[in-house]
């Protein structure tokens, strides 16, 4: 049985710590990120520096957000001025204050699986400051993020993130690549925010809408996943003439494309691109 101790540090379950130790996977992730010397690189949860080390071979400085106080001090001692360490919870961190005019953030990380979905939604607030994001996540979560309509994995997470990002499944990572090994398979995803026009609209294939309205709509739609939308969205009949717009309520929630949910949200909340901006 593999010990939870790695490089003199005991992995803490409450922080969801699983340290990446597979060199081939590490190099694959760094190559996928392909950092350039002038990038503003931000790592969430650097841990013991498995990604930090090879990334600092390509960039002169980085910023990291780390919650574990023991690791914060260790990182500061090890990297000195090359690493600006922000001690705190990424779920409450203001990533916007790291942005540099004309140099959007490149955010990376082996994210704690116990907070991955809330953290992804938190980061949506800063998408206008971001060039791209590369994250290690539970494979099931990545599958849901990139899922197509009609698949079992397609759901609220798929819709909410696909409206704001173009996403790609980069590579799979087996449990043995970590110490301690998690009980699930992992994967790396690339997330590229859809840019905005000069007027503030998203250049997304799914148009633009009020994210809060969309979130409430999708939550209702998927509240009874096995039933058709006639059962979950009928309360909206006074606000939307579904027949007039050709929206089939005889489908299940996972059968409806992202664009159709966005259109419903626009009808419910109007054109609110300015409210969905970070």
UniProtKB/Swiss-Prot annotation:
Keyword match Transmembrane: no
GO cellular component, one term: cytosol
Pfam families found in the cross-reference section: RrnaAD
Chief localisation class: cytoplasm
Disulfide bonds: none
Binding-site residues for S-adenosyl-L-methionine, renumbered to this chain: 18, 20, 45, 66, 89, 110
EC number: 2.1.1.182
Keyword Methyltransferase: yes
Catalytic activity: adenosine(1518)/adenosine(1519) in 16S rRNA + 4 S-adenosyl-L-methionine = N(6)-dimethyladenosine(1518)/N(6)-dimethyladenosine(1519) in 16S rRNA + 4 S-adenosyl-L-homocysteine + 4 H(+)
Cross-referenced SMART domains: rADc
Keywords, sorted A to Z: Cytoplasm, Methyltransferase, RNA-binding, rRNA processing, S-adenosyl-L-methionine, Transferase
Localization of this protein: Cytoplasm
One Gene Ontology MF term: 16S rRNA (adenine(1518)-N(6)/adenine(1519)-N(6))-dimethyltransferase activity
Role: Specifically dimethylates two adjacent adenosines (A1518 and A1519) in the loop of a conserved hairpin near the 3'-end of 16S rRNA in the 30S particle. May play a critical role in biogenesis of 30S subunits.
Entry's family note: Belongs to the class I-like SAM-binding methyltransferase superfamily. rRNA adenine N(6)-methyltransferase family. RsmA subfamily.
Protein name, entry field: Ribosomal RNA small subunit methyltransferase A
Species this chain originates from: Cupriavidus pinatubonensis (strain JMP 134 / LMG 1197) (Cupriavidus necator (strain JMP 134))
